[in-house]
Amino acid sequence: MKRRGIMKRKQHLYKPAAIGMTILMTAGLCSCQGTSPSKETEKTEEKSKYQITEENEAKELVMNHQPESSYWFPEQLLEWTPEEDPDLAYNISTVPLAERVDKENLTPVNKTQNKDTEVMAISIMNSSTSGNAPHGLNKADCNVFTYWQYVDELVYWGGSSGEGLIVPPSPDVTDLGHKNGVPVIGTVFFPQDVAGGKIEWLDTFLKQESNGTFPVADKLIEVAQTYGFDGWFINQETEGTEEEPLSPEHAQKMQEFIKYMKKQASELRVVYYDSMTCDGEMDWQNALTDKNSMFLADDQGNPVADEMFLNFWWTEDKLADQKLPEASAKKAEELGLSPYQVFAGVDIQADGYLTPIRWDLFESGENSTHTSLGIYCPNWAYTSAQNLDEFHKKENTLWVNSKADPSQEITYASDTQWHGISTYAIEKSAITSLPFVTNFSTGSGTKSFSDTCGNRKQRNL
């Protein structure tokens, strides 16, 4: 996605450092870091045979030989098989997607909540593409998301030109989403040239055999079905070079690739990001237009991808007079699509709920919205916090509102002041039967106990 800033990435033991401009998608989380370890701590680490190296600049303890969540370049994915995956057993989600209460049985708690408006959260759930444990670590400091009731789909954000472009969600995140009735999908990320992108990666990805099959598409399907997650988000932003340019043929192949995936595995979701157009150009539309609609519907009106995540500039003053969310809704209806298959993107990675948003452009004026809503990097609540208490308070304001109560009417100083996601998204629940059982844990803690004894921090979503 087109980004304004660069954030520093964490690096992990024995993993290549990502190229500095991998900004764009998996910028590292650098909050809540502790002080330098004491001598006593160093002795404990030595006794436990943990290794801390210069590469691990956050001093995060990484256990030797721990299983690792997967990530690949296209050519590596083609070589992957479940039978030869050493960490297969650890990377499989074991929780089926829970059924949610039917939206028609939900009751709005304010006059602007809409049962049809959906929310897609694109979130950095782990701090980097590589080095992620599938199920927890001995640390309490982590992005423990707790507002699943406002999310309809979670994109597990990852990928970098220095580590891998194809990133399935870690199974702990998939399990947590599924418990709450939220589909979780992985990321396919082709970075811009300035961030290390190579057109050869896209060519390998889109290669079609003479029999009409797409080998990488088959592997994406196999990975999702084997690991137990729900689909893929495709972000293609590699521009190519004068010698090897991006072309209309790439756009056509991408459409065919997505249609092939949906034909082979209709149950898997495919989301396309508003980037490459039908002309084979990087031209962010910030709306559903004639230039990018081919990735939602072909010329005969047949469906392609399930949804589209629009770029973020529709809310900027220079484009405000075009009323792009409204125009997108009209274009969707013209194509025979639901306008709620289109997600107006909001980039809050840098400033969170301090980000100015033209909500008046998003609202339809009928206690509804023109499109659905896409939130890029709601993990800001975690990365900007100095401690877990601040994290939870920021997350509450971000997802609910400044009064921490979705039923409260709030008078805003301007149309651009943060409204809170609960302003538009109705609360959804996966609790459809009794008994209801919970341990009241968010998934992290300062103590882990076994036989009533324990002194180790833990994170286990």
Provide a role label for each language-model segment.
Residues 2-16, 20:
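Bacterial Sec-dependent N-terminal signal peptides
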Residues 28-31:
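C-terminal motif of bacterial Sec signal peptides marking the signal peptidase cleavage site
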Residues 33-35:
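Bacterial signal peptide processing site
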Residues 40-148, 268-269, 278:
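N-terminal module-boundary/linker segments of secreted carbohydrate-active enzymes
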Residues 50-102, 234, 391-441, 458:
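Ser/Thr/Pro-rich, acidic low-complexity intrinsically disordered regulatory segments
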Residues 111-327:
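Chitinase-like catalytic core of GlcNAc-active glycosidases
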Residues 269-272, 288-291, 299-461:
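Substrate-binding and catalytic surfaces of secreted/luminal carbohydrate-active proteins
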